Amino acid sequence: MMHTLDAKRMLCPMPVIRTQDKVKTLSAGEILAVTCTDPGALNDIPAWCRINGHKVIGTQRDDDEIIITIEVGDGK
């Protein structure tokens, strides 16, 4: 199932914190699409995923919006 998180207009570290909070509510294998506007999230969210056992399965940049798609792993 695809879940979404709107982290637009949030600055570091809020996109990562909101992503972490949302992932805690999901099960392994579920997909989360995080939409944000902070360019730092392109580095911060994938780094957080690597550390916590999740997988970035896609990134998309559209004007000012960035969408990072994550597959939730076992390591919530």
Identify the function of each model-found stretch.
Residues 2, 31, 63-67:
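A generic structural signal for beta-strand entry/edge sites
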Residues 1-8, 33-35:
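Short amphipathic
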Residues 46-76:
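C-terminal structural segments of small proteins and small subunits
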Residues 15:
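Short glycine/serine/threonine-rich phosphate/pyrophosphate-binding segments
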Residues 12:
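Short cysteine clusters
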